[in-house]
């Protein structure tokens, strides 16, 4: 039975009912709706709407219903209720009779869904932080195991300077750390409870909304009822954080796809996260990474969709706001899955250290070291940059690396170049020189790994 039928003389059209109903997706709020109802029962008992005996009856019934859902949430989807609020109320009435009809006193579905969504978002933030930490653990483990894997670093997808695979892993650790902190910040702003705001103007009963908030795991009640039932900032913040994180995960996946390709062959992804071709027997496709990269779009779409939905809404609640749910539900499931699969991809990754080193030795990635060498000899950097550019052109024409040029050949470009140039052109020297904080110097990378382990409690 609908919660609003008294005003109407005709039944809702079946097509409209399907269009309007939300139980098929907002069933995910079932536990939050029940917990919110338990809190509300206590609040209205405090102002004499319910007796203590009635309060206890309702709480027992609601907890029974909660247990039933936890054992089999699919029972909800067998019903044709309009939404999760209607479903919970109807099941409560089945258990306690007319007493169940008293629970909604002073409450609107507007503040009810607002608190349900905020409670759900709080749970999601915690779960997602756990998934982020798990992927960070895998990145640190992989970094620790591959500190000696020298590889080319890229700009413009061209070999730029030598790095290590460990340094690459720690770059994504840092991105995820920012994602983690954004969730922490978003969670802090979910500390206010909208329940008790009514439809838009507040409740007519003098309940202690701060006490209600604390019963439901919030710090305080919201300060403005109009804002309370209209606010979906917490949904937007989660979607925004998810979108930024999916950018990081997509780049992570793209790097691995490239590193795994035959063109680079820096590493091999495990059979556990790859698939084959129905036609080409030799293929081993990086589908896990490609799906992470591809799924970023649907998360971005959820954020864009909700921003567009909310931008022109007048205060307070409008049915448009029902459109906040499918996007956030899908986006959080997608983000969580991508974090989990990202960690799985790293479990059995096999880095080809010979190939990565060979690639690092190509592409003149030690050219910057030669420029720094000239600077140390008293030549201004801009001039040194030009000299090294000419030397690189010469080496390319000979199809040789810089370190293969003779001293006589080097002196064509500047007379200060001598035998002492060769040690600084080695890959080890290139790495060692980058010793400032955050650099690829092996000791700095080890320090970063140890600091990350402390941060993760490893």
Curated annotation (Swiss-Prot):
Q: Where in the cell is it found?
A: Cytoplasm
**InterPro entries reported for this sequence:** Arg_succ_lyase_C (IPR029419), Argininosuccinate_lyase (IPR009049), Fumarase/histidase_N (IPR024083), Fumarate_lyase_CS (IPR020557), Fumarate_lyase_fam (IPR000362), Fumarate_lyase_N (IPR022761), L-Aspartase-like (IPR008948)
Q: Which GO terms describe its cellular component?
A: cytosol
Q: Which UniProt keywords apply?
A: Amino-acid biosynthesis, Arginine biosynthesis, Cytoplasm, Lyase
Record flagged with keyword Lyase? yes
- Please classify the protein's predominant subcellular localization into one broad category: cytoplasm
Q: Which GO terms of type biological process are on file? A: arginine biosynthetic process via ornithine; L-arginine biosynthetic process
Q: What is its EC number?
A: 4.3.2.1
Stored Gene3D superfamilies: Fumarase/aspartase (C-terminal domain) (1.10.40.30), Fumarase/aspartase (Central domain) (1.20.200.10), Fumarase/aspartase (N-terminal domain) (1.10.275.10)
Per the record's keyword annotation, is Amino-acid biosynthesis included, yes or no?
A: yes
* Pfam family for this entry, one: Lyase_1
The record's top EC class is lyase
Single GO MF descriptor? argininosuccinate lyase activity
Q: Which reaction does it catalyse?
A: 2-(N(omega)-L-arginino)succinate = fumarate + L-arginine
The metabolic or biological pathway listed in the UniProt record of this protein is: Amino-acid biosynthesis; L-arginine biosynthesis; L-arginine from L-ornithine and carbamoyl phosphate: step 3/3
Looking up HAMAP family in the UniProt record yields: Arg_succ_lyase
Concerning PANTHER family, the annotation shows: ARGININOSUCCINATE LYASE
Instruction: Give the family per the record.
Output: Belongs to the lyase 1 family. Argininosuccinate lyase subfamily.
Can you name this protein? Argininosuccinate lyase
């Amino acid at each position: 039975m609908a919660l609003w039928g008294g005003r109407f003389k005709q039944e809702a059209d079946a097509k409209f009912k399907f269009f309007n109903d939300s139980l098929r997706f907002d069933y995910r709020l079932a536990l939050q709706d029940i917990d919110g109802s338990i809190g509300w029962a206590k609040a209205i008992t405090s102002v004499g709407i319910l007796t203590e005996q009635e309060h206890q009856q309702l709480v027992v019934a609601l907890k029974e219903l909660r247990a039933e859902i936890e054992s089999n949430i699919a029972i909800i989807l067998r019903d044709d209720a309009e939404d999760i609020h209607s479903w919970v109320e109807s099941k409560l009435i089945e258990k306690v009779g007319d007493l169940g009809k008293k629970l909604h006193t002073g409450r609107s579905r507007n503040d009810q869904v607002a608190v349900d969504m905020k409670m759900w978002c709080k749970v999601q933030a915690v779960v997602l932080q756990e998934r982020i930490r798990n992927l960070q653990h895998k990145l640190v483990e992989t970094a620790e195991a591959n500190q000696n894997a020298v590889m080319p670093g890229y700009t413009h997808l061209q070999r730029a300077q030598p790095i290590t695979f460990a340094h690459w892993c720690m770059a994504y650790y840092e991105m995820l750390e920012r994602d983690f902190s954004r969730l922490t910040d978003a969670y802090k702003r979910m500390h206010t409870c909208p329940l008790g705001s009514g439809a838009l103007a507040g409740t007519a009963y003098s309940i202690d909304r701060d006490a209600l908030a604390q019963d439901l795991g919030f710090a305080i009640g919201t300060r403005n009822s109009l804002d309370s039932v209209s606010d979906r900032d917490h949904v937007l913040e989660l979607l925004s954080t998810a979108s930024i994180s999916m950018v990081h995960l997509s780049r992570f996946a793209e790097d691995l796809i490239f590193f795994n390709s035959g063109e680079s062959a820096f590493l091999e992804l495990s059979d556990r996260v790859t698939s084959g071709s129905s036609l080409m027997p030799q293929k081993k496709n990086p589908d896990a990474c490609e799906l992470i990269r591809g799924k970023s779009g649907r998360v971005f779409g959820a954020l864009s969709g909700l921003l567009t939905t909310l931008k022109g809404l007048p205060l307070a609640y409008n049915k448009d706001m029902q459109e906040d749910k499918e996007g956030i539900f899908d986006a959080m499931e997608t983000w969580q899955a991508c974090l989990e699969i990202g960690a799985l991809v790293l479990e059995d990754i096999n880095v080809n250290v010979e190939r990565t080193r060979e690639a690092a030795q190509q592409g003149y990635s030690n050219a910057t070291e030669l420029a720094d060498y000239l600077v140390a000899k008293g030549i201004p950097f801009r001039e040194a940059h030009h000299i090294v550019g000419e030397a690189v052109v010469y080496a390319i024409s000979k199809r040789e690396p810089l370190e293969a040029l003779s001293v006589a050949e080097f002196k064509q470009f500047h007379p200060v170049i001598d035998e002492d140039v060769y040690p600084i052109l080695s890959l080890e020297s290139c790495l060692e020189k980058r010793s400032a904080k955050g650099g690829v110097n092996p000791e700095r990378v080890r320090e970063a790994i140890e600091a990350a382990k402390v941060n993760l409690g490893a």
